[in-house]
From Swiss-Prot:
Signal peptide: none annotated. Its EC number is 2.1.2.3, 3.5.4.10. GO terms for cellular component: cytosol. The keyword Transferase applies. GO terms for biological process: 'de novo' IMP biosynthetic process. Keywords: Acetylation, Hydrolase, Multifunctional enzyme, Purine biosynthesis, Transferase. The modification N6-acetyllysine is found at K287. Belongs to the PurH family. This is Bifunctional purine biosynthesis protein PurH. The gene is purH.
Length: 529
């Protein structure tokens, strides 16, 4: 049963005025009476639209610098009144039914994001009347349509045209869901902000409490339902943040291939975030959330060829990420050489997509070009709780490194050390990465002891016939014993980059000196669990 409700009267009060004039014109052209407030009313009047100010309708002026505009029984009675049940009392108090409410809220998020925003500024951008109208209309969705997103304007007009000026219950219910999501997200932002301001508010500190309020409210929007999760007996969906500011797997568009799986998305994220570390043309190949080959080159084809050489066996069925447009030559090389689950790049040429289309199962994603990395939060779910931390955006340059051994690294060793240090950040701990000439030649990931990660990296290099002598090695955390250095030296490593900080640093440095290895301390750790 459609349960259509005609739209005869609409109340419009928006902070974000994108598209509101055109929407109001369309409503007016269909005989809808327009009520409005403040700046929205002035804008519509300036455009020649017949509009009644809410203060004229209620007979009560706006007051307290606009804090009180719509908090009136004639407004909320018109929204909440149940058609066919409350008609008599509405008529007794001269309350006209309001069939549609078009509201978006004061820009609280934009206000508090501004540098130097005071608590007073934030408070004045907490909307009261707006959320009240939104919730009233959503509660009475059986009779009233609530519109909080400008992206819905065109579809609403089309449905009205298809239904003789009416909207169906299904549409009103869908709009009500969006409305409650909108107010929930809005209240969450305010609660998070106030929660982080508690010490400053009570005079305990001049600074806010930081990024972590005492109650953490999160809002994510479902982007995809998945066939299943990490395993086939687990149900799953993919949720994303609204207004993501950095190109990511969350913002990516799938331009080709079958549906993404849970594991595809997780691995694609790992590959893309790693390739973002490099300014030069780069390729990252990931398998089970770990890089199995990384390289930079003169072109992305060169980078791919070199990354693939690290571990062709593991590259089978992997995820490939680039930091440049996917071109036809590179696409052909991939398709001719290996089975690949996902290719992600900032963009893809038409010629490249024609080539990858020959393999229907290959998923191709484009995410747009990225700029600077955006600070944010990382989450890890534990049973009954949530671990929250800042994203690991830590970086070191050559000028920040400390040479702690007798021998200084050569220029090439230094370049390779910085290269494999970037890669190690994205390898599961304990992480060891061997690199030579700006390509990985062996990766040891996820071992419970660091020395075994070092041994595995050497074994991988030997298995592929890659020359380790003269290579650099990165370790995501300090060496607790000298055995990792001994293993690296036995494989042929001549330079080591690591955080330092072990109580046995002296022994580790002495081991490096014994082997003639140059050692660099970053004073920064990159655990990844």
């Amino acid at each position: 049963m459609q349960q259509r409700r005609p739209v005869r009267r609409a109340l419009l009060s928006v902070s974000d005025k994108a598209g509101i004039v055109e929407f109001a014109q369309a409503l007016s052209a269909r005989g809808v009476e327009l009520l409005s407030t403040g700046g929205t009313a002035r804008l519509l009047a300036e455009k020649g639209l017949p509009v009644t100010e809410v203060s004229d309708y209620t007979g009560f002026p706006e007051m307290m610098d606009g804090r009180v505009k719509t908090l009136h029984p004639k407004v909320h009675g018109g929204i909440l009144g149940r058609r066919g049940q409350d008609d008599a009392i509405m008529e007794e108090h001269q309350i006209q039914p309001i069939d549609m409410v078009v509201v978006n809220l004061y820009p609280f998020a934009q206000t508090v994001a501004r540098e130097g925003c005071s608590l007073e500024d934030a408070v004045e951008n907490i909307d009261i009347g707006g959320p009240t109208m939104v919730r009233s209309a959503a509660k009475n969705h059986k009779d009233v349509a609530i519109v909080v997103k400008s992206s819905d304007y065109d579809a609403i007009i089309k449905e009205m045209d298809d239904n003789e000026g009416s909207l169906t219950l299904a549409t009103r219910f869908d709009l009500a869901i969006k409305a409650f999501e909108h107010t929930a997200a809005y209240d969450s932002m305010i609660a998070n902000y106030f929660g982080s301001m508690v010490p400053a508010y009570h005079g305990e500190s001049k600074e806010a409490a930081g990024r972590f309020p005492r109650t953490l409210n999160l809002n994510f929007i479902k982007k995809l339902d998945m066939r299943y999760g990490e395993n086939s007996h687990q149900q799953a969906a993919f949720y994303i943040e609204e207004n993501v500011k950095e190109a990511s797997v969350a913002t990516a568009t799938q331009v080709q291939g079958k549906a993404l799986s849970y594991n595809n998305i997780a691995d694609t994220d790992a590959a893309l975030e790693c390739v973002k570390e490099f300014a030069e043309p780069a390729c990252v190949i990931v398998k089970h959330a770990n890089p199995c080959g990384v390289a930079i080159g003169n072109s992305i084809l060169d980078a791919y060829d070199r990354a693939y050489k690290t571990d062709p066996t593991s590259a089978f069925g992997g995820i490939i990420a680039f930091n440049r447009e996917l071109d036809a030559e590179t696409a052909q090389a991939i398709i001719s050489r290996q089975f690949v689950e996902v290719i992600i790049a900032p963009s893809a040429s038409e010629e490249a997509l024609k080539i990858t289309a020959a393999k229907q199962n290959v998923r191709v994603l484009t995410c747009g070009q990225w700029g600077e990395r955006v600070p944010g939060l990382d989450f890890k779910r534990v049973n009954g709780g949530l671990l929250v931390q800042d994203r690991d955006l830590g970086m070191v340059g050559a000028e920040e490194l400390r040479v702690v051994t007798k021998r200084q690294p050569s220029e090439q060793e230094l370049r390779d050390a910085l290269f494999c240090w970037k890669v190690a950040k994205f390898v599961k701990s304990n992480a060891i990465v061997y690199a030579k000439n700006n390509m990985t030649i062996g990766i040891g990931a996820g071992q419970m002891s660091r020395v075994y990660s070092a041994k595995i990296a050497g074994i991988k290099a030997a298995d592929e016939g890659l020359e380790v002598k003269g290579s650099s090695m990165a370790s995501d955390a300090f060496f607790p014993f000298r055995d990792g250095i001994d293993a690296a030296a036995a494989a042929g490593v001549t330079c080591v980059i690591q955080p330092g900080g072990s109580i046995r640093d002296d022994e580790v440095i002495a081991a490096a000196d014994e082997h003639g290895i140059a050692m660099l301390f970053t004073d920064m750790r990159h655990f990844r669990h």
